[in-house]
């Protein structure tokens, strides 16, 4: 018989928020008796943009900006009903995107 698994993927621009959210999820799952694998840090996605400083001339003078998207992945193996209820009631910060898949 195959075990049920919940895969949680977190995305955020601030690594402190994502680590705090991952710790809350792990604590909640362990309190209800589930086995947690992770959080596994996935590669940070870096988007870089070059913007002209001057609207008229000086093409060589540019600003460089970047957006870093941090990601964490964790699996909750063989969750109970209490685990699912506790995760649904969990209040996470606004800057964290949570993607949950049942496998």
UniProtKB/Swiss-Prot annotation:
Protein's GO biological process: translation
Gene3D superfamilies in the cross-refs: Ribosomal protein S10 domain (3.30.70.600)
Disulfide bonds listed in the record: none
Name this polypeptide is given: Small ribosomal subunit protein uS10
Cellular component annotations (GO), alphabetically ordered: ribonucleoprotein complex; ribosome
Domain of life, source organism: Bacteria
Primary role: Involved in the binding of tRNA to the ribosomes.
SUPFAM superfamilies: Ribosomal protein S10
Family (UniProt): Belongs to the universal ribosomal protein uS10 family.
GO molecular function, one term: tRNA binding
Keyword field: Ribonucleoprotein, Ribosomal protein
InterPro entries documented for this protein: Ribosomal_uS10, Ribosomal_uS10_CS, Ribosomal_uS10_dom, Ribosomal_uS10_dom_sf
Subunit structure: Part of the 30S ribosomal subunit.
């Amino acid at each position: 018989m195959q075990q049920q698994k919940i895969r949680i993927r977190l995305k955020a621009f601030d690594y402190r928020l994502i680590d705090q959210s991952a710790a809350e999820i792990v604590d909640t799952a362990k309190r209800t008796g589930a086995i947690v694998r992770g959080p596994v840090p996935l590669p940070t996605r870096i988007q870089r943009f070059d913007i002209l400083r001057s609207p008229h001339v000086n093409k060589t003078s540019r600003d460089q900006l970047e957006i870093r998207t941090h990601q964490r992945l964790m699996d909750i193996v063989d969750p109970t009903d209490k685990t699912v209820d506790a995760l649904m009631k969990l209040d996470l910060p606004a800057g964290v995107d949570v993607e949950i898949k049942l496998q």
